[in-house]
A protein has these predicted regions:
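Hydrophobic h-region of N-terminal signal peptides that target proteins for export
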Residues: 9-18
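Glycan-recognition and catalytic cores of secretory/periplasmic carbohydrate-active enzymes
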Residues: 20-158
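A periodicity- and composition-biased signal for non-globular, repetitive helical segments
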Residues: 8-9, 102
Length: 158
């Protein structure tokens, strides 16, 4: 399951790169894959370094601190005793942080970050329902989901 989640995230990350127009007849510019670019100038290089060293770790620590992972842990073991709190879209903070860290890993190797992402993906994968559905605000307490979730799956798609 973890491999499926990783493959899905990587596919989503790589799709925009594959969708770019390739250089060819009448098109003077050939796109470069972002994994082939090394930004080292003093302006953007420093910002990418700050993202890697400060922003990504801070974002993951905020996910821990604010209970984002707890929602997934509860969804992995649903119970009517769980009171669904917070915002129904809190899960996206976890997904976007994984996405940002994954982009960073494409250009800067970091074994500790890979291990940490794997540990988060373990938590996320355990929260998925057997058919792959995942919405912690509904899954952690299916009989009493978050008020914005609707009475059944897909009932509030708008």
């Amino acid at each position: 399951m973890k491999k499926l989640v990783i493959a899905t995230i990587m596919a989503a990350v790589m799709m925009p790169a594959n969708a770019q127009k390739k250089g060819g007849h009448g098109y003077p510019i050939t796109p470069v894959e972002f994994t082939k670019v090394k930004v080292t100038d003093s302006f953007w290089g420093q910002r990418l370094k700050a993202s890697r060293e400060v922003t990504i770790p801070l974002a993951f620590s905020k996910c821990e601190e604010t209970g984002r992972y707890t929602n997934f842990e509860k969804a992995a073991n649903p119970s009517e005793s769980y009171k669904v709190g917070g915002l129904s879209f809190d899960d996206t903070d976890v997904y976007k942080t994984i996405e940002g860290a994954s982009y960073s890993l494409q250009t800067y190797s970091d074994k500790r970050l890979v291990q940490y992402i794997d540990s988060v993906l373990d938590i996320v994968a355990k929260a998925q329902e057997p058919d792959g559905y995942l919405y912690t605000s509904r899954t952690m307490n299916p009989k009493h989901p978050h008020e914005w979730a609707g009475d059944k799956r897909w009932s509030k798609e708008e």
